[in-house]
């Protein structure tokens, strides 16, 4: 959510800044802007809505200048309007900001009492006034920033231009990511390595409280105590090529269809097929001492964690606690020193999850993370890094990253079971074979795309939709409901099938489609009983099952979607596909913005 790009360059930077924003578009935004220093003036262009609107503004009113900053904004304080869009200009400074300044109200009151005028509703403008005030009092840019940063409470990343210093940008971070990039005769900063990848692969990640002075020929980094600091310069590995949709209508559609490939790529790091072994990509995981596992995540990653709870307890017989990251710290969880805490995040920058990780670290927990960005903040703070290999995921609604998380978590559960002596070599070989079958099974599920597209019109008119499942299919019901509400804006809820009679059944009538995830197996008959309860009250059922399940219970359903018969271990990876495709095709029918649904952000970097 929100994105920052900055360049201190050798030639005009406006187009490159815009290109950098395009690379950050996946993070989610509702307005955008660019500011450069041109002829001794701060020149700015801003637009509400998509980057296409900013492109039109730049075409009508071009910008020149070799130093500039750019920003995509996801509104927190103040509506998504041009007036609230970044960059903000306050006298001699212009700035962009990701995050939230929690104490902006008393700071704003202080500044208003001095007679300062505000032009926006944002918390960001407060920072601009504070820095401008220091500059107007005679401070250098460095001294002004050093004086202001200690006054800010919250999580933020900031980039500042100074009108009288046309070859300078100062960036700072606390709780939100910021990266500096080292070029040839010019330097950069960005919210992540992807933003600067076309210009440099040599980057450094700022630590908590760091601020950086970026000039054309040098970058100086200071810590929170204003002492010079050295941060390791690394090769980012971020692709400099733009991520294209190819022949697909949307990034989400493309990413759904990439799942067989990326799950196979991910499993290559965790499975030794010839040895019939699960192997984590670390030299020594020391899992035999784990007596309890704590899992923390948000959104789709949380549902992946719920599936993992079933697997870990079934295979390793290790008890699992799982929490939504935004609640974890505030309930003061009981954590025994030396326990293992597992954090799941696509971006590795999710603010709530990162804060929970640091809380667990303070409680002397060992930290394991499952992330799709191995250079992210969470990855850098982990004791045990478990990367997925989904590649860049542009669609805000997660699909392929979720499936890769499931693949990693299945491998972790099996590895933990072996470490605890709960898995025989033959059982481990069987798990390896089942995991190796997953990509082909996912591909078989994708073959039902046209069928699912044809039945989407049965769901699209609904105002409410229910999803039901038992066992590991219950988290998949939750995930299916989340996908539908995220991109189609239809109210949807997921429930454990056995909970229907405890309240949700009151919602059932002929206008409420009920999506049932029910592979044949030990829990199938129980789920069929719940389907009968729905049918008796006029509910319209869409049954997602295998051929055996559909033969037994498909009669009388509004529609059925046949999945391949698979082992229960990989069923969640397979059954993710139909709920993703159903949500996608319903959203297309309704004409929503599939890749960037309203009010949502890909990388949620505020609490």
Model-found features: residue ranges?
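Conserved short alpha-helical segments that host acidic/polar catalytic motifs at enzyme active sites
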Residues: 1-245, 249-250, 258-291, 330, ...
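Glycine-rich oxoanion-binding loops at beta->alpha junctions
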Residues: 66-83, 270-285, 308-344, 350, ...
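Glycine-rich, anion-gripping cofactor-binding loops and their flanking helix/strand elements
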Residues: 179-204, 326-361, 499-533, 566-580, ...
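Extended hydrophobic-aromatic, low-complexity segments
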Residues: 181, 304-306, 321-322, 351-354, ...
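Active-site phosphate/pyrophosphate-binding segments
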Residues: 259-263, 267-294, 363, 384-513, ...
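Glycine-rich phosphate-binding loops that contact phosphosugars or nucleotide phosphates
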Residues: 288-437, 517-522, 526-559, 582
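Generic C-terminus detector
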Residues: 540, 553, 566-607
């Amino acid at each position: 959510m929100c994105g920052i790009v900055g360049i201190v360059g050798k030639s005009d930077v406006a187009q490159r800044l815009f290109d950098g924003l395009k690379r950050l578009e996946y993070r989610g935004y509702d307005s955008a802007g660019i500011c450069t220093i041109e002829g001794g003036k701060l020149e700015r262009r801003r637009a509400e809505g998509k980057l296409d609107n900013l492109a039109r503004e730049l075409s009508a009113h071009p910008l020149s200048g070799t130093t500039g900053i750019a920003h995509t904004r996801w509104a927190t304080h103040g509506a998504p309007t041009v007036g609230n869009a970044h960059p903000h200009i306050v006298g001699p400074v212009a700035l962009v900001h990701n995050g939230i300044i929690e104490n902006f109200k008393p700071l704003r009151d202080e500044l208003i009492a001095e007679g300062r005028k505000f032009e926006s509703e944002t918390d960001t403008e407060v920072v601009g006034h504070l820095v401008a005030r220091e500059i107007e009092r005679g401070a250098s840019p460095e001294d002004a920033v050093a004086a202001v940063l200690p006054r800010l409470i919250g999580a933020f990343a900031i980039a500042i231009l100074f009108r009288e210093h046309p070859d300078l940008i100062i960036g700072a971070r606390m709780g939100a990511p910021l990266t500096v990039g080292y070029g040839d005769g010019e330097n950069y900063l960005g919210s992540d390595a992807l933003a600067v990848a076309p210009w440099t692969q040599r980057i450094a990640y700022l630590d908590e409280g760091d601020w950086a002075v970026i000039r054309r020929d040098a970058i100086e980094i200071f810590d929170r105590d204003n002492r010079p600091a050295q941060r390791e310069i690394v090769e980012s590995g971020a692709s400099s090529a733009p991520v294209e949709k190819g022949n697909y209508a949307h990034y989400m559609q493309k990413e759904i269809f990439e799942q067989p490939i990326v799950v196979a790529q991910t499993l290559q790091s965790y499975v030794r097929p010839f040895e019939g072994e699960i192997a984590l990509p670390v030299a020594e995981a020391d899992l035999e001492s784990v007596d309890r596992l704590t899992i923390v995540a948000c959104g789709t990653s949380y549902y992946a964690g719920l599936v993992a709870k079933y697997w870990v307890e079934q295979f390793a017989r290790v008890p699992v606690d799982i929490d939504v990251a935004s609640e974890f710290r505030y309930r003061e969880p009981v954590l025994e020193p030396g326990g293992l805490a597992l954090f799941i995040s696509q971006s590795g920058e999710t603010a709530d999850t990162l804060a929970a990780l640091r809380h667990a670290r303070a409680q002397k927990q060992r930290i394991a993370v499952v992330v799709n960005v191995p250079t992210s903040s969470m990855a850098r703070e982990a004791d045990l890094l478990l990367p997925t290999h989904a590649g860049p995921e542009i669609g805000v609604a997660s699909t392929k990253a979720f499936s890769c998380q499931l693949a990693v978590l299945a491998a972790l559960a099996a590895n933990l079971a072996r470490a605890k002596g709960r898995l025989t070599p033959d059982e481990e070989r069987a798990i390896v074979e089942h995991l190796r079958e997953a990509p082909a099974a996912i591909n078989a599920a994708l073959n039902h795309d046209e069928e699912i597209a044809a039945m989407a019109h049965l769901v699209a008119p609904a105002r409410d939709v229910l999803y039901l499942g038992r066992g590991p299919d219950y988290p998949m019901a939750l995930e299916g409901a989340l996908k539908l509400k995220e991109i189609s804006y239809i109210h949807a809820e997921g429930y454990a099938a056995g909970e229907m009679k405890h309240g949700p059944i009151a919602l059932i009538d002929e206008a409420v489609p009920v999506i049932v995830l029910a592979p044949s197996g030990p829990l199938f008959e129980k789920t069929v009983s719940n389907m009968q309860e729905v049918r008796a009250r006029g509910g319209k059922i869409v049954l997602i099952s295998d051929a055996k399940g559909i033969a037994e219970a498909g009669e009388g359903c509004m529609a059925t979607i046949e999945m391949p018969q698979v082992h229960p271990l990989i069923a969640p990876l397979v059954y993710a596909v139909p709920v993703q495709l159903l949500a996608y095709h319903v959203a297309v029918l309704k004409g929503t913005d599939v890749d960037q649904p309203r009010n949502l952000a890909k990388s949620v970097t505020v609490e």
